């Protein structure tokens, strides 16, 4: 088990938390980051690119001139791809770029990302963070005290006050623990977890 310091919102140590080495202090595998982030970015692509082929371009139903005895090259339609205003030959069509990464790979990548933040001393665990009302200035002050600027804050989805407080901060974001992913961990410089959230991650990733 790895020991982690637990802080209050002013970064005063209030206790320690034992967490599984396999989840928070394992080996960092950067190739897993590549695989999972590539899949995530691929799934984010809209895939709506399209051009009109000759069947979609309006007009061109009539043969422009007779087949023979004109001295010109034979043509069947003014909307063929070699004509100005014609359809595009073999152009892009809408497609779905997403593909699945095995669940074991996704879990291993997430464990590796948590271990990376722990190794870099960019993982901060707080006892709890439950503001009474959304206050962006207060959230900024807390993150500054924790030394966690451009941070990803993770807690229960029900903590709406915290989510609204953090989302207006430039470079920082809030994620529900169920939605934690490798891409967002790597995209932020620091990771802030509550003690309960850390325990939930340990249980789900062990």
From Swiss-Prot:
One of its GO terms (cellular component) is ribosome. This is Large ribosomal subunit protein uL4. Coiled coil: none annotated. One of the primary rRNA binding proteins, this protein initially binds near the 5'-end of the 23S rRNA. It is important during the early stages of 50S assembly. It makes multiple contacts with different domains of the 23S rRNA in the assembled 50S subunit and ribosome. Residues 63-72 have a biased composition (Basic residues). Signal peptide: none annotated. NCBIfam families: rplD_bact. Part of the 50S ribosomal subunit. Keywords: Ribonucleoprotein, Ribosomal protein, RNA-binding, rRNA-binding. The keyword RNA-binding applies. GO terms for biological process: translation. Belongs to the universal ribosomal protein uL4 family. It comes from the Bacteria.
